[in-house]
From Swiss-Prot:
Protein name according to UniProt: Chorismate synthase
Superkingdom of the source species: Bacteria
CDD domains reported in the protein's UniProt record: Chorismate_synthase
Purpose: This reaction introduces a second double bond into the aromatic ring system.
GO biological process, one term: chorismate biosynthetic process
Signal sequence, renumbered to the chain: none
Top EC class for this record: lyase
Amino acid sequence: MSFNSFGRVFRFSTWGESHGPAIGAVVDGCPPGLELSEADIQPWLDKRRPGTSRFTTQRQEPDQVRILSGVFEGRTTGTPISLMIDNVDQRSKDYSEVALAYRPGHADYAYDAKYGFRDHRGGGRSSARETASRVAAGAVARLVIPEVRIRAYLIELGGDRIDPAAFDDAAIDENPFFCPDRAAAARWEAIVDDARKAGSSVGAVVECVAEGVPAGWGAPLYAKLDSELAAACMSINAVKGVEIGDGFAAARLTGETNADPMRPGNDGKPVFLANHAGGIAGGIATGQPVVVRIALKPTSSILTPVETIGRDGKAADIRTKGRHDPCVGIRAAPVLEAMVALVLADQKLLHRAQIG
């Protein structure tokens, strides 16, 4: 199974399965001399960690990271950084039905069609458990781009959207939904509770804003910054759509409305009067905040019986036992931050290599 790596200069690979002994990442291309310890990584993993509220999977994983290589006397050496996270709370017996029949909407059938063999326990490599490795790698990436502030939050859950006028950055860390609208967060409690009680699930939309990205990062045509971000975002489990800036809404605007007018600033740089483009033009950063949005489908593993087929090709019904997120989008916020950080760290080093 190939394609477990991402990036060009700042590159990372993830490894491990949901119910294997451990998962992890190897970060290659990190500059030497950066201060790095487990304490720099753990807070980001704690944001994604399961079992922290009734609104996420009740799988209890401490997600304690260990640095196995690439760091000496508290600093990166420039060699590959190996990160490992033990799996301690697997219940593989809950997946006995999944071994024989495919979960509609999940990767079960597609993996079998391609490889003819799969690890059915918790979804194996296709499980969202893999994203913990990305978050660990993303924490290293943040050290490469200290000038950039990255913040992700949910703007929609189960079809219910936040009120932009009620946006409060301080509220994001006050609720289990990473929601910037306190009233929406209160409504979402009932939406997720109802979905869980019904044995169902709901989707979500997560937005991420990266501030401090310098003008010039990125590239034209086939290596656009927005195409790199889109590829990174689409690699996240359950993501079915990506928008940059206004995204699909831009198709409903006129040229005058969609333009991002500029005025001269006191420092010789432009002052933008709007940011419909999401901080990227021609594949290159403009210096404005980079805005990315992802849409996540409802979790495929549900208790409600669903029509499917077995590995033998015969008709079957399946209801997925085990512990699953009623909304996988909730814990996607720190994962999206990590993927944006990984792309931007790579872009910074690429820009330095190209321009000096």
